Each structure stands twice: as structure tokens, then as C-alpha cells.
Amino acid sequence: MYLQLLKSLNRLHPRAWDFVQLSRMDRPIGIYLLLWPTLVAVWIAGNGSPSLKNVLIFALGVVLMRAAGCCINDFADRKVDGHVKRTADRPLASGRVKPREAVMLFALLVGVSFLLVLCTNATTVWLSFGAVALAFCYPFMKRYTYYPQVVLGAAYSWGIPMAFTAAGGELPASAWLLYIANLLWTVGYDTYYAMVDRDDDLKIGVKSTAILFGEADRVIILTLQLLSLGCLLLAGNRFDLGGWYHLGLLAAAACFAWEFWSTRKLDRESCFKAFLHNHWAGMLIFIGVVLDYALR
């Protein structure tokens, strides 16, 4: 249904599908992975009753900024994507979209996102510049460092402090526990993603934590996930979250255990499935937060 709706945009313009693929709107997994921790922060910052305005601003902001990040990512990778089996048919790599068109779409999406942020307050507006900087820098990091996933984690977590300042204008120290938790979680699941392309990346000189971790990859990922849960547990104690929240964390831990077990053969398909599976972990934690506030 969702994909059919997107494909129907071709009736409006013959190249619409190319830009849908460029912004990765046809693959919403990235939206989910960014949305759940952001909504967790929105809910906690709003003490379980966030304003509808803030929910809409951050939900739409997630969709727009994730799309913007995909545009600039493909722009940065346009000369290497053609050498990787999974990415060879992307719009920029295949020549269906021009580099300047990708940059223009990136700017448009960032501009619309900024209009949303203007509906909050000055502190949140200033923080939003950090979000743009991280989104722009991340795609280029894989050329220079084995830690591009850390930069992605910082970018994917930036909505958390923004959610708190948007709710009350102040940023409590405990909010950074949520930030660190999400950064660690992001590094973990994006390492699974990088493991899919590891052989190709080694050939073309692209760096990643999957290459850095080597044979210890799954153990390190599980360690990062457990550390993330530890930070979430501490944050929950600081924000007086109880049983339902802890149940959500326990369910997420079960997801992480399944990912560790399912990737024991290190084949591409299982690593990609493990990456996708993190959507459920994020959703379960969010449900735990919502229920914990709603059932008090």
C-alpha cells in the first residue's frame, strides 16, 4: 500500500520515483530507527503528556532529516556506490539523478525541517544547526576514519536533546544518558549493516566499524547493546520510570540476543536481517515508556 502510493507519484512526474529512491522514502527502516528514540525523548521530556505540536514537529522532522541525510550520503558515495553490489543501482550511482539535484533536494529538505524547528524556541533552533552539521559530515567520515558509525550515532541521537529543550527550554543532565544510550545502540546496529558490505568496502577502501572490529564484531555489538540498555536503565531511574519501562528494556534485550544468535554464520542476509530487527527493539522500548506513563 505504502510503496504503491509512492510509485503513483510517477503520474505527477516521470522522475518522481528516482527522487523517492534517492531520499530512501521507499525504505522506511531508517525512519523507524530514528523515530523511536526521538519519540522516547519527546514522551519523557513531556512527562508522559507531550504536546501534539511537539510530537508532530519531531515526527515530521525525523522523516525530513532522514531523507536529507540519505541525499547527502548518496552524493558523497556517488563514485563508490557503483562498485558495491547492494548500492550499484542507486539513483546517483546509476546516473538517473545528477549530483547537483541531490544537493538541491538536501537543501530543500533541511530548509523545510528548519521551518518546523522555528515553531519551538531559540535553544532548540540553535541546537538544530548541530543536527545539520552531523547529517552533512557523516557520509564523508567513512573515507577518513573507522568510526563513521559513531558520527551516525551522534546524528541519530541529536533529536533527544532537542526534544527536551523544545519541551521546557532546559536540557537536564539525565537527558544525556538517553543520548549516549542511543549513540551506542546506533553504532551496534549500523555495524550489522556495515557487515553486509564489508567485503566490498575492503576492496574499495571504505572504512567502518565492521572492518575495525573484525572477528570480534558480534561480541562488540552485543556489548554496545548491553551498555545502551544500562544507560537506559539509569535514565529510567532518573526519570522515575517503572515496571512497564523495565519490561520494554527486557523485550529489547531479547531482541538483541536473537540478533547475536541469528548472525553466528556471518552471512550477508542474516546481518541485514539483524540490522532491520532493531526497529522492533526501539519500538518495544517506546511502548514501554508510553505504557509506564499511561498506566500510573
UniProtKB/Swiss-Prot annotation:
Keywords: Cell inner membrane, Cell membrane, Magnesium, Membrane, Transferase, Transmembrane, Transmembrane helix, Ubiquinone biosynthesis. One of its GO terms (biological process) is ubiquinone biosynthetic process. Gene3D superfamilies: UbiA prenyltransferase (1.20.120.1780). One of its GO terms (molecular function) is 4-hydroxybenzoate polyprenyltransferase activity. Its EC number is 2.5.1.39. The keyword Iron does not apply. InterPro entries: HB_polyprenyltransferase-like, Prenyltransferase, UbiA_prenyltransferase, UbiA_sf. It is a multi-pass membrane protein. It is found in: Cell inner membrane. It is an enzyme of class 2 (transferase). It catalyses: all-trans-octaprenyl diphosphate + 4-hydroxybenzoate = 4-hydroxy-3-(all-trans-octaprenyl)benzoate + diphosphate. Its main location: membrane. CDD domains: PT_UbiA_COQ2. GO terms for cellular component: plasma membrane. Pathway: Cofactor biosynthesis; ubiquinone biosynthesis. The chain crosses the membrane at residues 28-48, 55-75, 102-122, 145-167, 174-196, 219-239, 241-261, 275-295. Its cofactor is Mg(2+). It comes from the Bacteria. Catalyzes the prenylation of para-hydroxybenzoate (PHB) with an all-trans polyprenyl group. Mediates the second step in the final reaction sequence of ubiquinone-8 (UQ-8) biosynthesis, which is the condensation of the polyisoprenoid side chain with PHB, generating the first membrane-bound Q intermediate 3-octaprenyl-4-hydroxybenzoate. NCBIfam families: ubiA_proteo. Belongs to the UbiA prenyltransferase family. This is 4-hydroxybenzoate octaprenyltransferase. The lineage of its organism: Bacteria, Pseudomonadati, Pseudomonadota, Gammaproteobacteria, Pseudomonadales.
